[in-house]
């Protein structure tokens, strides 16, 4: 008997690869992960609000179980900005601009927040799973192909995400922490069925 399908709704190949790598660490993961890129409206609000609305819309569009993800990078000196709007900030001002936002502030600490959402299907409850990693904003270091990874030095490592090999990143990142909670939920759910 084959495993039920779970669709990860994303158009970001880097996120998809990380999720596949992290899920592969779970022996006998009870779902077959597929991927679909949907054009979904993104509301404005907290990361949790965005993740919940996006997942409900995706489940309705797909007519089945799905997961979505929303990521934020919050600068403590700016009260959590850019937060869930980091993607737009990156497109507009890039790594250097994000660094310049903190010029004049002693506090360069930041929180990376990942919220995964799971929905079993249309009109079903959306479940949220949040992971958080602390760090400090630094001038870009390492490859620049994956969002803001080069500017967040992770607390206690001396490395930015971009400087880490995928195995190291995928055992301590905000995405890993959120996915671990999601995996535990999904494994428990599969045992109930």
Curated annotation (Swiss-Prot):
Note on cofactor: Binds 1 divalent metal cation per subunit; can use either Mg(2+) or Mn(2+).
UniProt-listed Pfam families: Ham1p_like
Keywords carried by this UniProt record: Cytoplasm, Hydrolase, Magnesium, Manganese, Metal-binding, Nucleotide metabolism, Nucleotide-binding, Nucleus
Main location per the UniProt record: cytoplasm
Mitochondrion among keywords: no
GO terms under biological process: deoxyribonucleoside triphosphate catabolic process; nucleoside triphosphate catabolic process; nucleotide metabolic process
Source organism, top-level taxon: Eukaryota
Enzyme's top EC category: hydrolase
Residues binding ITP, per UniProt: 10-15, 54, 70-71, 87, 146-149, 169, 174-175
EC number: 3.6.1.66
Reactions the enzyme catalyzes: ITP + H2O = IMP + diphosphate + H(+); dITP + H2O = dIMP + diphosphate + H(+); XTP + H2O = XMP + diphosphate + H(+)
Keyword Nucleotide-binding annotated: yes
Cofactor(s) required, per the database record: Mg(2+); Mn(2+)
Binding site for Mg(2+): 42
Function: Pyrophosphatase that hydrolyzes non-canonical purine nucleotides such as inosine triphosphate (ITP), deoxyinosine triphosphate (dITP) or xanthosine 5'-triphosphate (XTP) to their respective monophosphate derivatives. The enzyme does not distinguish between the deoxy- and ribose forms. Probably excludes non-canonical purines from RNA and DNA precursor pools, thus preventing their incorporation into RNA and DNA and avoiding chromosomal lesions.
PANTHER family: INOSINE TRIPHOSPHATE PYROPHOSPHATASE (PTHR11067:SF9), INOSINE TRIPHOSPHATE PYROPHOSPHATASE/HAM1 PROTEIN (PTHR11067)
Family: Belongs to the HAM1 NTPase family.
Name of the protein: Inosine triphosphate pyrophosphatase
């Amino acid at each position: 008997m084959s495993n039920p399908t779970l669709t990860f709704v994303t158009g970001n190949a880097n996120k998809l690869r990380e999720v596949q790598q992290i899920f592969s660490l779970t022996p006998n993961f009870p779902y077959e992960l597929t991927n679909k890129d949907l054009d979904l409206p993104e509301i404005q609000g907290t990361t949790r609000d965005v993740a919940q609305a996006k997942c409900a819309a995706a489940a309705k569009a797909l007519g089945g179980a799905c997961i979505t993800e929303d990521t934020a990078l919050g600068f403590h000196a700016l009260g959590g900005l850019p937060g869930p709007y980091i993607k737009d900030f990156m497109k507009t001002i890039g790594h250097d601009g994000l660094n310049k936002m903190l010029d004049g502030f002693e506090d360069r600490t930041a929180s990376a927040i990942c919220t995964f959402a799971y929905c079993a299907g249309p009109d079903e409850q959306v479940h949220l799973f949040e992971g958080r990693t602390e760090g400090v904003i630094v001038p870009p270091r390492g490859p620049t192909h994956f969002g803001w990874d080069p500017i967040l030095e992770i607390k206690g490592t001396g490395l930015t995400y971009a400087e880490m090999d995928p195995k190291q990143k995928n055992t301590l990142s905000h995405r890993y922490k959120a996915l671990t909670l999601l995996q535990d939920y999904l494994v428990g759910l599969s045992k109930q069925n």
